Regions:
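Extracellular attachment/recognition segments
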Residues: 34, 38, 42-130
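Short, intrinsically disordered N-terminal pre-domain segments
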Residues: 2-11, 124, 128-130
């Protein structure tokens, strides 16, 4: 019984060491879980998201919460329409993406012609950070 606690600690250390062998689990490296946020994973994957408030400018620059490694990332977004909005929107054109920002074209078409949208915009970007 004298060495019971030492043996117990040794057994726990051995079990922990064996359970960690061959583990390829992807860990969260850092994160910011706000409305405009990101999650960085240990394998280099970076997922970012955010919302852009309405604007009357035809092109709006959206600054990413953190920078990507390069410009080979994908952006997906959607217009958040008001109930009375009868305009027609297509995929939003993206202009000159950089590692820390992208520009979004806010034009639309309607039965009375074309114009600049004041609608809110929600987006998500996926790429790498290392």
């Amino acid at each position: 019984m004298i060495y019971f606690s030492r043996k117990l600690v040794a057994i726990i250390v051995v079990i922990f060491a064996q359970s960690s062998l061959g583990t390829n689990a992807i860990q969260v490296n850092s994160q910011s879980l706000g409305q405009n946020g990101y999650v960085k994973y240990s394998n280099g994957l970076l997922i970012q998201w955010g919302k852009q408030p309405g604007s009357t400018a035809s092109t709006v620059t959206i600054y990413l919460p953190t920078s990507f490694y390069d410009t080979n990332y994908v952006i997906h977004g959607c217009i958040i329409k008001d109930a009375y909005d009868e305009n027609v929107y297509t995929a939003t054109s993206l202009v000159n993406p950089t590692v820390s920002s992208f520009k979004m074209d806010r034009n639309f078409g309607s039965s009375s012609g074309t114009g600049v949208s004041r609608a809110k915009y929600s987006w998500m970007a996926i790429g790498r950070w290392k």
